[in-house]
Amino acid sequence: MNILFKTTVLAASLLLAACNNNDDQEAQTAPSTNPSKYYQTKTPYQPQQDLKSYEQAPTGFQPVFTELVARHGSRGLSSLKYDLALYNLWKQAKAENALTPLGEQLGADLEAMMKANILLGYGVEGIRQYGYGNETMTGILEHRGIADRLLQRLPTLLNAQAPILVQSSGVDRAVDSAKFFTAELIKQQPQLKDKIVPLSYTNLSSGSVPSVEDGGVDRFKLYFHSLNADEDLAQPLSVSQQKIYDASQAYQDFEENNKDLAQKLDELSKNTQAEKTAQMVLSPIFKADFIKKLGTTGYSFSNTGSFTVTPPKGEQITEKGKGKNTIASAVDAAAYIYELYSISGGMKDELKGINFDKYMPLEAAKFYAEFNDANDFYEKGPSFTESNQVTSEIAQGLK
């Protein structure tokens, strides 16, 4: 049995692309019938069908192998950017008395969002370093749920003597996801601990770190989109690894410098619906005169400055923005609100009842999800004919 944890791809054999959020091995979770909220890639995992409805092995046959390729679980924001930039914008609107009653609520909600992300994983066993980019409790339960469903789906395979091979990209949240998955296997069936390889995936302790050396990390297989000389050329490469490395460099150059790609993304950004959608999002929050000022002199807002929180132990923790993310128009401001809306779907526990749905009309969410999907199609997906399969050649290690 092979278990691979990526940071970019979600797929699984035997329809194991979803999970329940219940630690009880006997629990059965019905598929979700909730309408889409257009969280796009931030959509929390849900079972796609009732476990009992999966096709059974034909009479006289039994499962002998399964492979799961999974993305990390639901996470928080990757860094202090959209939230801080919006907070700086909000403070200016507050100073000018340019907030609606709904807009008045946004400040406290942004503060709660920043605090939740700064403390994400704080005191949680299995999270190596708390803070931005970590899995949320929803994300942790997703991978525990996948393990539970696997045990129910293939009990005879997991009871066999075959090893359970686990690898990840080495990125913190991917490693942690793999560990929560294996921890649930061990919790439900302790004898499986001796079958999990390498040993570093059998312990939630932050001191147990999978590596290239123990076989628990393979960036050429699971982080191929971002290989670099410092991390990936320390040892001589095999012929196949060299091909993947070269393909990775070609992809990164394509993403940064390809003129056809830049032109296509520019065309997408000039969608005439963008301004109308931005007004739909911003008008209930900010007064019209303030919205008109966005992008004019003095009315661009970046993620500059810092935000300080106090965790349960009483010490102060300060996170600083890098100033690289800027709101230079109403369109930018609305798109940033969508980013917080979409991430909030997987942060229910951490946000403690704060709901960003009130800031994002469903029609607007649909627009931003479709816009992001279109960008991803050209940057990461099939792209266009002239890209010469540069977006797929990097994945040759998965063949």
Locations of the language-model features?
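Residues in flexible loops and secondary-structure boundaries
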Residues: 9-13, 143
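Bacterial signal peptide processing site
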Residues: 20-22
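C-terminal motif of bacterial Sec signal peptides marking the signal peptidase cleavage site
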Residues: 15-18
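Signature for phosphate-centric chemistry
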Residues: 27-163, 169-399
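Sec-dependent signal peptide recognition
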Residues: 2-10
